[in-house]
UniProtKB/Swiss-Prot annotation:
Organism: Acidovorax ebreus (strain TPSY) (Diaphorobacter sp. (strain TPSY))
Gene this protein is translated from: coaD
Gene Ontology terms: biological process: coenzyme A biosynthetic process
Catalytic activity: (R)-4'-phosphopantetheine + ATP + H(+) = 3'-dephospho-CoA + diphosphate
Taxonomic lineage from the root: Bacteria, Pseudomonadati, Pseudomonadota, Betaproteobacteria, Burkholderiales
Function: Reversibly transfers an adenylyl group from ATP to 4'-phosphopantetheine, yielding dephospho-CoA (dPCoA) and pyrophosphate.
Main subcellular location of this protein, as a coarse class: cytoplasm
Keyword Ribosomal protein: no
Subunit structure, as described in the record: Homohexamer.
Gene3D superfamilies for this protein: HUPs
Protein name: Phosphopantetheine adenylyltransferase
Keywords per UniProt: ATP-binding, Coenzyme A biosynthesis, Cytoplasm, Magnesium, Nucleotide-binding, Nucleotidyltransferase, Transferase
Entry's localization field: Cytoplasm
EC number annotated for this UniProt entry: 2.7.7.3
GO CC terms: cytoplasm
């Protein structure tokens, strides 16, 4: 039987508990999952590519069938080049669906052999986004409940803060 590989792409700046939830769900559905961290030249990221990849590896270290790689360019080409047959995308809201539905159609036109699989996060993670985590953290708020402990530590360090006692 063939092994089924899925790719979960994103910027992961930083990886959140919502991302981790989706990766773990995908790992139950697919034999292998690649967390594809975008090089993202078009975005100003808080964390470097190496930092984002290391945080993802640390957060998902307990998932042996998950690997973390970087990619540049079209994620469909990255997926096809690795023999992937599915891309995993998370949906938190109807707004996410509208955008992701259009993107899935374009991706299917570009690489017909790669399907888009939509997963919804567990209810406690539906409102979490990397953007909000960065904004709350930058403004001095506590984001410990939205990211794993290792990511939280790195975020505090990056923002020049220390953990509350």
């Amino acid at each position: 039987m063939a092994h089924v590989l899925a790719v979960y792409p994103g910027t992961f700046d930083p990886i959140t508990l919502g991302h981790e939830d989706l990766v773990r769900r995908a790992a139950r559905l697919f034999d292998r999952v690649i967390v594809a961290v975008a090089i993202a030249h078009h975005k100003k990221t808080l964390f470097s590519l190496d930092e984002r990849m290391e945080m993802a590896r640390q957060a998902l270290a307990d998932c042996p069938q998950v690997q973390v790689e970087s990619f540049e360019g079209l994620v469909t080409e990255f997926t096809a080049a690795r023999g992937g047959t599915a891309m995993v995308r998370g949906l938190r809201s109807g707004t996410d669906f509208d955008y992701e539905f259009q993107l899935a159609g374009m991706n299917r036109a570009l690489v017909p052999g790669v399907e888009t699989v939509f997963l919804t996060p567990a209810s406690q993670y539906q409102f979490i986004s990397s953007t909000l985590v960065r904004e709350i953290g930058t403004l001095g708020g506590d984001v410990a409940q939205f990211v794993s402990p290792g990511v939280h530590e790195r975020l505090l360090h990056k923002l020049g803060r220390t953990a509350a006692a």
